[in-house]
């Protein structure tokens, strides 16, 4: 009997090992030079030991593009050699590295407009409007201009190749200008259809042509009239209908940064067939609540959890409280799940 119990337990352990590991993802930005990536590389062993197995690195225009050098941001952007060096470190530590390029929105921040729209102002969805970026959150590119996609895909290709990436995060959060009265090309048009068209354009290039997995933020796909998340975590401008017009193998990353009793967006995406990677931020209690709800209510399409680090100083990353406490909770939940599986198959004496 003891031998039987041991054999069954060993079988359970073997099955657990063979299952895909839950994603313990860390989103990082402002590592915009080779030196910054090299410094981050020194933290990778500790992050791996803590349990991080996915890094989503927001690159954007901080890369030494060869196809379009005019679109480099800063005087010392990440080089292909620097990217390759960092990717090699990640691979050695079994960390999946996923680069990100903010698409459609986030083409400016405060008074600074980023290289695409400064070099090609005709790509702006609201050309000539909002001087000094006053009166808007961020500038957006025109998804109906085919020249935009031709150039952007060249940038994405360079980043994918440099980081040897098998997945790519395209951003696409906080979009507010589609269908704007100030937008000659999209004025009066259905923002949900426009948004879906943009998502599908990128999907065709990344997934169908480059054969990489595609991730995107989920806020513009959540109906803010149905789910009470407000106009930032959800959409009140019509883009949410795009959720039924895009491929279901896109990985959706809904971000929720406040404590709630439930997070129905996660279940909504899963019920529609998407895989989901929820993201939290700086509030420890909110992080615990999001992880707890996700792990309790979601099934196999829940990939894990993403920790975002907006505003976190680089020298404080390893001790970032939501990261430390969130990983601790995830370990506790995973341990309980393994124990529960063993109890279900272990014969009683």
List the predicted regions and their residue ranges.
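Aromatic-lined carbohydrate-binding/catalytic grooves of carbohydrate-active enzymes
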Residues: 48-82
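Glycine-rich, aromatic-flanked loop segments that form ligand/cofactor-binding clefts
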Residues: 21-24, 46-60, 87-129
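The substrate-binding groove and active-site-proximal loops of carbohydrate-active enzymes
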Residues: 24-35, 68-80, 133-150, 184-194, ...
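Hydrophobic faces of well-ordered beta-strands that scaffold small-molecule active sites
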Residues: 24-28, 55-57, 97-99, 168-170, ...
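Short, acidic/polar
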Residues: 33-48, 153-155, 260-266, 287-293
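Substrate-binding cleft of secreted/luminal carbohydrate-active enzymes
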Residues: 277-349
